[in-house]
Amino acid sequence: MKHFFSIIGGMGTIATESYVRLINHRVKINKDQDYLNYILVNDAQIPDRTAYIKDHSKPNFFYDLKEDVLGQAKLNPDFFVMPCNTAHYFYDDLAALTDVPFLHMMRIAVHKFVEDFPKEEKIGLIATEGSIYDHLYVDELKRVGKKAELGGSEIQPMVNELIYTDIKEKGIVDHDLYHKILQTMHDKYGCNVILLGCTELSLAQEKAPDHPYNVIDPQSIIADVSIELALKIRNGMDPKEATKKYMYK
């Protein structure tokens, strides 16, 4: 197969399925051959990311990701994409394993926020406890001179319920709970824009988009970027040249 990209997924599987569905439905097609070429590694056995980030005595998820990246690197994909925000805890270590361009979903999303909402000084952040605990998005926002609003103590339990109880355990999206979280971040904490810092939250946005709030959806953004890059490379652009605009430092 020529000109394909590799997806490091399975964190969780339903969220990865959402990413794949987005790229398949958004690419303009007239025939089978117009779809994108990609290999999906749906490694559902990767240990819980938040558990390790908060407690290093828990299984380290780096080694599973390392094995997946090295295995795919042997096939020489045009670029890597990893649709899991919290897994970017090990982004630098994973990207260093290969010369293949490795997109940084969180960084790309933050730059999209700056581009789309240049006058906003802060953005509401809802994410896994792992991402919050290690300041993954907070640090990326600081790089571009923006602030993250995390809300009060009532926010994280609602986010955890939506991510873990509803989506990861039951495979459902509670529309009302998702909208309540967004409304609380907007009305109580003054967030004109809210960043969906977990791909399960991106799934919630896909399934329950009927609300009036501005969101930055990293999975939706990386899906569009994946399509853009894959088509440029298919049309003859060098992969490193194509990805250069998104390889933010």
Place the predicted regions along the sequence by residue.
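Non-catalytic structural scaffold of enzyme domains
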Residues: M1-K249
